[in-house]
Structure formats: structure tokens, C-alpha cells
Amino acid sequence: MTTNNLVLSGTITRSRRFKSPAGIAHSVIMLEHKSQRYEADMLRNVYVQIQVILSGPRFESVADNLKAGVEVQVQGFMTLQQGRNGQNRLVIHAENVELKT
């Protein structure tokens, strides 16, 4: 087994909720991360926008709080998801979420 684990904090810019045909609750958020990191002894501005998918009953207690402007920390794994336009994009499937605001 190989490692696929990511922890990222940021601000929710969009969110939506739905249930799958099997009745599983899903929340989908767009997470915006801004920070500064050192790379090769130089300070670098870091900016990321990435979709995060939260699935199943363990997230139902926080789903009402996942709204634009809320700061969160997400821990999960990354995978490719194919959009309706056929383009692949990287997304995070959350295993844990912590509200920061």
C-alpha cells in the first residue's frame, strides 16, 4: 500500500449538499488555501483551490456549518475525478474535517 494522505486548511468559497441514488449524504465544498512557504531558501506565495468531497453519515453533524466564508482543516486522500466535460481534476475525499471559525 502506498501513502495518500493530505491535510489542508483554508476557507470555503462554495458548498452544496445532495444525496446519492443509494441515499448516501454528500457535501461538496470548494476550499481556497493561501499561505507562504519557504522553498530553496526563498519565501513563496502558495495559492490552491480544490474541491473536497465529504461522504457519509459521519459528516452530517457538520454539514450545516459548511458554508462560504467558514475556515476548515480537512484531512483525506486525493484522487482524480472526471467532470461532465471529460476533463480530469484532482479532488480530496475527506476523512476528517475540523471547523476553525
Curated annotation (Swiss-Prot):
One of its GO terms (biological process) is DNA replication, synthesis of primer. It comes from Shewanella oneidensis (strain ATCC 700550 / JCM 31522 / CIP 106686 / LMG 19005 / NCIMB 14063 / MR-1). Residues 1-101 form the SSB domain. Involved in the restart of stalled replication forks, which reloads the replicative helicase on sites other than the origin of replication; the PriA-PriB pathway is the major replication restart pathway. During primosome assembly it facilitates complex formation between PriA and DnaT on DNA; stabilizes PriA on DNA. Stimulates the DNA unwinding activity of PriA helicase. Homodimer. Interacts with PriA and DnaT. Component of the replication restart primosome. Primosome assembly occurs via a 'hand-off' mechanism. PriA binds to replication forks, subsequently PriB then DnaT bind; DnaT then displaces ssDNA to generate the helicase loading substrate. GO terms for cellular component: primosome complex. InterPro entries: NA-bd_OB-fold, Primosome_PriB/ssb, Prisomal_replication_PriB. NCBIfam families: PriB_gamma. It comes from the Bacteria. HAMAP family: PriB. SUPFAM superfamilies: Nucleic acid-binding proteins (SSF50249). This is Replication restart protein PriB. The keyword Glycoprotein does not apply. The gene is priB. Belongs to the PriB family. GO terms for molecular function: single-stranded DNA binding. Keywords: DNA replication, DNA-binding, Primosome.
